[in-house]
């Protein structure tokens, strides 16, 4: 390459912004072209690149080729219009927002204390986003930490406060004494989760802290594998003929020999029925995970679309595979005691944007009508 010229063409006028001749004729060149002198304004323009090689063609002038590339200068952030009324959301629960954006975007959604939950574009061009209210956040903090955001194809970002009506919810708290027999039973059962830890107490604490945190991150990644449409309808169904043994966000403190050594939150419902009871899909959807996952043991996760998923763990067996489309009530597994569980039961959970929220809301047809489907229907009305 002997020479390169770059110009901006707009309204049939060419403004040359870069021109350089090279002493060495290399087959490939990388150049930086400053745009400061281009005098560009918002809108479309053509970037014209002319390159001349070092051959003797044209009486020694070389061969020249010109390429034009259609470009567009965009420095304006996208505009978001929220179509749903401000949601009412309780601590540990979930909410929905429908919105439109005035241009194509690379991503959009809701930020909850900096955690991004994507919205999904619908056939009518609007976006729907289910987003969580983390169980650890006070209402006054949560309502000031929810934002709606969008990034256009040029990288311009808009971000604004999303009005939410946040309410507190209380959760149960327990203090449990860890016995040596219990710690030994955990180590004997789950040593493979902490192979480098020899002490039974340290083994339990490693599983309760490190493995639990790693499992939560895995669930967030699983939560990204979702359909852009609602795959479910109606209230979710709980395990038939079951009794609740533990609730969502139960705060457990663990003592050993009278000293506090750890804590955890129980992020789901523990439901006990008969031994090896059939586990039905709580609603229609697509299976996105099956297999063993740390404290959850044998686990099935079903995607219901728009980042909403149901979770079934401690299973004795699994009767579906990833990719299966399941219907509400279809048997997907049997209850068991795999993972960090003692006694046959089902741990049932709900994920929104990869974050576990209380299943109670999704089991309630009135809550779904008032807070999800009714709001979406109203926002879509002409």
Predicted regions and their residues:
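Polar/charged, compositionally biased leader and regulatory segments
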Residues: 24-28, 75, 156-256, 371-382
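A short, terminal or domain-edge coil/loop segment
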Residues: 125-126, 135, 213-221, 348
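Solvent-exposed, acidic/flexible segments
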Residues: 1, 42, 139, 211-212, ...
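Repeat-unit-sized solenoid/scaffold elements
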Residues: 27-29, 79-90, 127, 179-191, ...
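Surface-exposed loop/turn and intrinsically disordered segments
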Residues: 1-126, 130-140, 146-172
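Catalytic cores of peptidoglycan-degrading enzymes
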Residues: 235-382
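Short, charged, solvent-exposed linker or helix-capping segments at domain edges/interfaces
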Residues: 109-110, 173-177, 360-362
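A general structural signal for short secondary-structure boundary/capping elements
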Residues: 95, 146-147, 194-196, 359-363, ...
